[in-house]
Each structure stands twice: as structure tokens, then as C-alpha cells.
């Protein structure tokens, strides 16, 4: 697995410790480090956040943490490393159909990285049939595409992206052929950023 350490080089920080030390401003739905620590001590149990929603840990590994912050919001943390520096990839996902993720990167002191470490691939890379002009034009007509991101359960260096715009019943009924030709795209952490995995172009 990855060798994760604090930037200062003192000792390794676990994904759970970084979650507990997360600035309250980044997680207003659970703005209490004590509550966050209690949550990790009781895996599988449900806690109530200050707004009355139920919070629980969905999965935790050495390099990833996935939580449900309420009935419609999930949060994932992944630990990444490059050139003796360590990074946190934070994925916040609204699961309301069509689901949408927001991805941000931080150092281990929770300073946000300004350079883009993930760029959304071209829409046609999500198609199983890239020769179909009708499907490609349908994607273009959709305009803004909703998408979700998720880590490989055991390895945050692998990230899966999936278009969710056609999970909506109305969009699906209008263009059912598009949803049938969509597939996820995998990204790999390489040289300090996520790039397309293998030969997906």
C-alpha cells in the first residue's frame, strides 16, 4: 500500500486522523472533531449530526474512508503520495438523481491545492460506441453532464468516473440509447495527478 506521512516527515497520519482534523468549514454538516472521532470509534453505528441527519461510516481502509453524511450526501477521502509529498483527495457526492460529485485536493494540513489534479475526460470516452454520431450528438445536446467519482475500495490511486445524467428517468426516456452505450472511465494517480488508466483513448 501507499507510504503515507505528514509533510513535515514526523509520523504517518491515517485517513481517520485526517478526517478528524478536517477543518469544520469543509464539513459543516458535521462541524465537531469530537463527533468525527466518535464516529470512527463506532464503525457500523449511526450518529446524528447537528441538523438531525444520520451519519455513518460506509467503509474504511488504510488509504480510503467513505461516509454517509445524511440520506443524500456521501463523502470520500483518499490518501495519495507523489515525490515524498502527500495529498488528500476529497470527493463529496450528492446522491439525489442525477448524482453529482465535487472533487478537491488538499495537502495533509488541509491547504487546498490550486492546480487541477483531475480533469474530466472528453464525454466520448464514456461511450462504448464512439462511432455513433447520433449518440455523440445526443451527449453534446445534453450540455452539462452530471457525473460521480469513487475510489477503488482498496486503492485510492484508482478512481472511477461515471456519467449520471441519464439516470434521471426523463432524460433516459428521451434518449434511452445513450444510457445503454455509457460505461465508466478509470483514472490512475500518476506523477501527481489523475490520468486516464491504460489505453482508454
Task: For the regions a language model picked out, list residue spans one by one.
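Short aromatic loop motif centered on NTY/YTY
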Residues: 115-191, 195-201
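Acidic/hydrophobic-patterned starts of short beta strands in beta-sheet-rich repeat architectures
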Residues: 83-93, 154-162
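Short, solvent-exposed loop/turn segments at conserved positions within beta-propeller repeat blades
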Residues: 49-50, 97-99, 177-181
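Short, surface-exposed beta-strand/loop "edge" segments at domain boundaries and coil↔beta transitions
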Residues: 73-76, 97-101, 137, 168-173
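Terminal domain-start segments
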Residues: 11-80
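Mid-length scaffold segments of soluble, non-membrane domains
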Residues: 85-121
Amino acid at each position: 500500500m501507499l507510504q503515507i506521512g505528514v509533510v513535515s516527515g514526523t509520523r504517518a497520519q491515517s485517513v481517520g486522523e485526517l478526517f478528524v482534523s478536517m477543518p469544520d468549514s469543509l464539513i459543516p454538516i458535521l462541524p465537531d472533531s469530537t463527533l468525527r472521532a466518535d464516529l470512527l470509534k463506532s464503525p457500523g453505528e449511526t450518529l446524528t449530526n447537528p441538523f438531525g441527519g444520520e451519519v455513518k461510516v460506509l467503509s474504511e481502509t488504510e488509504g480510503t474512508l467513505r461516509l454517509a453524511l445524511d440520506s443524500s450526501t456521501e463523502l470520500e477521502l483518499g490518501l495519495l503520495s507523489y515525490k515524498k509529498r502527500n495529498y488528500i483527495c476529497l470527493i463529496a457526492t450528492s446522491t439525489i438523481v442525477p448524482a453529482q460529485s465535487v472533487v478537491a485536493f488538499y495537502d495533509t494540513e488541509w491547504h487546498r491545492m490550486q492546480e487541477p489534479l483531475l480533469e474530466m475526460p472528453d464525454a466520448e470516452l464514456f461511450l462504448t460506441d464512439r462511432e455513433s454520431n447520433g449518440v455523440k450528438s445526443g451527449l453534446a445536446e445534453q450540455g452539462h453532464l452530471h457525473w460521480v467519482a469513487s475510489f477503488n475500495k482498496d486503492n485510492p490511486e484508482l478512481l472511477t468516473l461515471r456519467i449520471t445524467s441519464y439516470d434521471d428517468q426523463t432524460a433516459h426516456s428521451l434518449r434511452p440509447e445513450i444510457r445503454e452505450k455509457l460505461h465508466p472511465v478509470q483514472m490512475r494517480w500518476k506523477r501527481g495527478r489523475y490520468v486516464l488508466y491504460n489505453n482508454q483513448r
